[in-house]
Each structure stands twice: as C-alpha cells, then as structure tokens.
Amino acid sequence: MRADDLDYSRIQPEPLALEPLLLATERPDCGALAIFAGAVRNHHEGAAVSHLIYTAHAALCDKIIRSIEQETREQFNVPECRIVHRVGQLGIGDVAIYAVVRAPHRAEAFAALRYAVDSTKHRAPIWKEEFYPDGSSSFVSGCCIADGFEPPEYLKQLPQKANT
Amino acid sequence: MNVELQFWGVTARLAGSDRRRVTLTENATVADAIELLRGDAALAKELPRCAYAIGADLVALDHPLSEGDELSVLPPVSGG
C-alpha cells in the first residue's frame, strides 16, 4: 500500500469534495484527467425518488475499493486512481461517488475510469435504499459478490489482472 | 460457542434486526451459522445470493468460526 493511500477513508459520511482528490493525484507526467461523478437521480425504473440512504460495511468496503484502485493502476498502466463513496442520507443531486484517474493519455484514462467505477458498483459492499414520495422505501437490487457468481459480460472483456 | 450475525442491506429488513446472536457447536462453519436462518422464509430466499465476511475479510461457507466472531451477511450490492 502506498503511503499516501492512508490519508483518508474511501467511505465518507460527509458531502464529497473533488478538490482533495485532484490535489492528491496531481502529477506532471499525466496529460489526461478523467473524472466520474455519480449523483442521485429523482427517478428509478419509472418511479419518482425523493432521496436515498446508502449503507456500507465500512472496513470491507475500504479494503475492496483500495484493491480496485490498485487493480486499475496495474491493469491499465495508469499512475493514479482514487475512488470515494458517500454513505448516509443523500438528496437529489448529491454526489454519491467520485472516481478520478490520471494517465499520460486519454484512451487509457477513459478505459481505466470505467473499470474503476463499474468495479466499485459491482464489488464494494454498499447498499442503496430508495425512498419514494409516499414515504415507502425499497433496497435496489444489485450484484452478488459471493464466489461463484459470474461478473457482467462487459467486465469480463476488460484486461485480467496478470499477477493473481 | 456464540457468534453474532450482522445483517446488511435488505437482509437487515428481512431479519427484523441488524444483529442476531446464535449459539453453535464447536468446529461450526459459516454454513452451519447460515443454516440456522433457513427457517425464516423471507430471509432464506435471499441467502443464496449473499456473501459472508468476518471483519474486513470475505469468507467461504466452509470457513471455521471462532467464539465471538462477528459474521456479516452481505446481500447483492448496489453502490454508485
């Protein structure tokens, strides 16, 4: 683990700030900066959504997100990848996830960013509970992280980690 | 031995609580602990799609349990 990885948790209850991620990853050999921000929508599968509550198994989630960052750096040969996800109650428009990738060129930055975001959505132990205008709620059906479950097709097509 | 189950996401709603203490025989595994939940029909339906963790480590169904373990039941995830 890199020393500067210890400076913050990948799971945060406070509103997410992009600036610290940009400052922590700044480097002169990277001409491409790719950023993804995932914000809360006011609808899902045709139903109006009033707000969300995210919960996470913080210790496992922090560990898995750090490993996704490392995989992303290794598999796409990009020097910087940072991901942070918010938990707690989020309103419409609030940012739930930031992912930042820096690379020498844009092609690997875009590919690495998609891998980082998709892997976080499919592997990090985070659960989204949607609340509706009538006060009811439901958990969004998600991705199984148990051994033996096949990843989605598009994740299979990405480069496989060579050293594990 | 005593083990505490911790339910996450929809499993907490289905279990009616986010924690449940269970008593198991010595040499029990994760599978033995989960077997105790199969009497709860709504929860049992979700279990085939759950993963399990102790602390910050995912564990397999044949992982041996120890006195005082906190075993997390992790349903399908939906972050992002």
Question: What are these model-derived regions, one by one?
Answer:
Chain B
Residues 1-79:
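Ubiquitin-like/PB1-type beta-grasp interaction modules and other compact soluble beta-rich domains
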